[in-house]
Regions:
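Acidic Gly/Asp/Thr-rich repetitive segments characteristic of extracellular carbohydrate-active
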Residues: 40, 62-108
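Structural detector of coil-to-beta-strand junctions
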Residues: 147, 174-177, 200, 229-234
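Right-handed parallel beta-helix
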Residues: 128-133, 154-165, 182-198, 210-235, ...
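Bacterial Sec-dependent N-terminal signal peptides
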Residues: 7-48
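Binding-interface segments
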Residues: 206
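Primarily auto-inhibitory N-terminal propeptides
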Residues: 49-63, 71
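Hydrophobic alpha-helical signal peptides and transmembrane signal-/tail-anchor segments
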Residues: 1-7
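Extracellular beta-strand-rich solenoid/capping regions of secreted or surface-exposed proteins
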Residues: 98-104, 115-132, 139-160, 165-183
């Protein structure tokens, strides 16, 4: 089943509307301070649209999470979770974002802001991760000159990520700014995927046996594809459950 709800609206991509994370919160994955979608739930129904699947014994990823991926719990459900603080803008090494997402079961927060040059490499997310870009101070974090992948990641929460791929990545015209080929229970919220040279964000199972299901992409921007054929997104999931694409802005794609 597929749920596609496209509501095009003005979305301020500046970091001025990002939510602060109070220092007193011991676990930012449990209380990531979001209230973007006002809901009145009754058996999965909301005031903002039709019923989405809700597992009765599961808390949503964060307040305002909707759709098939809303029950992803990131690192929250892991008994051996740890909080990793990104302390520099390096592409690799201790304190870098790449090092932060190299291991499963992590809540990733930031005490640095600026541009991270991925050096034409893929940033790969792992199982049971909660990556909270809105915790960065100042103007936040921007990823550049590379791409992200959530392939084979299960129980993933990514919020407020800004990915700018660019034409120069490997000299190729078939690079997506982000996406996944297989995996389940993933949610992306208030992200922007731009300057892709194939699609900006793709969920392409392509008959992979592991499947791609229980995914939500919400409140995000997919735009400014860099090639004549570049598109906003490609969605081809497996037969299990589905994908929710909700309240996103697709703009300036071919």
């Amino acid at each position: 089943y597929f749920v596609f709800l496209f509501v095009f609206h003005r979305w301020n991509c500046n970091q001025s509307d990002k939510e602060p994370v109070d220092e007193e919160d011991a676990d930012p994955a449990i209380n990531p301070h979001s209230s973007y979608l006002e809901e009145e739930e009754s058996g999965g129904n909301t005031s903002s649209g039709p019923a989405f699947p809700v597992l009765a014994n599961y808390a949503p990823a964060f307040p305002g999470a909707v759709g098939y991926g809303r029950n992803a719990d990131g690192a929250r459900g892991s008994n051996n979770r740890e909080i990793y603080v990104v302390t520099n803008l390096n592409n690799s090494g201790a304190g870098s974002l790449r090092d932060a997402v190299s291991q499963a079961n992590r809540i990733v927060v930031f005490n640095v802001s600026g541009v991270i040059d991925l050096n034409k490499e893929v940033l790969v997310f792992k199982d049971n991760q909660t990556v909270l870009f809105q915790t960065a101070p100042g103007d936040g974090i921007e990823l550049y000159n590379g791409r992200t992948s959530s392939t084979n990641a299960n129980n993933l929460i990514v919020r407020y990520m800004r990915m700018r791929t660019g034409r120069q990545v490997s000299g190729s015209d078939n690079i997506d700014a982000g996406g996944a080929a297989y995996g389940h229970d993933q949610i992306y919220d208030h992200c922007s995927f731009t300057w892709g040279t194939d699609e900006c964000f793709s969920l392409n199972n392509d008959k992979q046996p592991k499947g791609l299901y229980n995914i939500t992409l919400q409140n995000s921007i997919l735009g400014q594809g860099c090639q004549n054929h570049s598109c906003g997104g490609l969605v081809q999931t497996s037969d299990k459950e589905g994908v929710t694409v909700f309240r996103n802005l697709f703009i300036d794609n071919k």
